[in-house]
């Protein structure tokens, strides 16, 4: 598979994300994958598979709309919007979060992925007591 084919497969994987698709991860990610996001750092394919399984376990759904893909020699950049619903956040209402991913390839598979998104907007602002505090702090920081 080529780097471009892997990238297309990754986009399709995220746009139709659910736990039944986790078996596709070895076709997309290198066995030495290092995935970094605001939650933490996850090293190795088995660890990344478990991380996805845990994330999806309690979600009502989680899907991505990829709005931009830029491919370079051994790198790529994605811009995306994640739409998700979790019973513990906002009473299970649909949530939306924009973010981006930087990808690096080795042997036509993704060996490094860093996801950038606002963890406050995703989680902290949605929690009952903490959310109002975070929003007040953000308001104070505005000019």
Range-by-range predicted roles:
Residues 4-7, 22-26, 30-74:
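A solvent-exposed, acidic/Ser-Thr-rich amphipathic alpha-helical stretch
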Residues 10, 14, 29, 52-55, ...:
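Hydrophobic alpha-helical core bundles mediating ligand binding, dimerization, or RNAP-core interactions
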Residues 57-63, 70-143:
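A beta-strand edge to alpha-helix "cap/lid" segment located at domain peripheries
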Residues 13-16, 51, 126, 140:
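Residues that form generic nucleotide/phosphate-binding pockets
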Residues 2-20:
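Short, aromatic-enriched amphipathic alpha-helices that serve as compact interaction elements
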Residues 20, 39, 117-120:
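Intrinsic disorder/low-complexity detector
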Residues 18-21, 87-89:
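Short, charged helix-to-loop "capping" segments that act as catalytic/coupling loops
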């Amino acid at each position: 598979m080529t780097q471009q084919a892997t990238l297309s497969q990754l986009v399709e994987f995220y746009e139709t994300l659910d736990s039944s698709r986790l078996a596709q991860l070895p076709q997309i990610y290198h066995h030495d994958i290092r995935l970094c996001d605001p939650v933490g750092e996850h090293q190795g394919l088995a660890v990344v598979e478990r991380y996805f399984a845990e994330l999806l376990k309690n979600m009502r759904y989680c899907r991505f709309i990829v709005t931009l893909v830029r491919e370079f020699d051994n790198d790529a950049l994605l811009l995306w919007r994640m739409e998700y619903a979790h019973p513990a956040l906002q009473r299970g209402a649909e949530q939306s979060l924009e973010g981006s991913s930087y990808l690096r390839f080795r042997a036509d598979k993704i060996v490094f992925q860093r996801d950038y998104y606002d963890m406050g907007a995703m989680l902290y602002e949605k929690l009952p007591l903490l959310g109002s505090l975070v929003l007040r702090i953000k308001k104070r920081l505005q000019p």
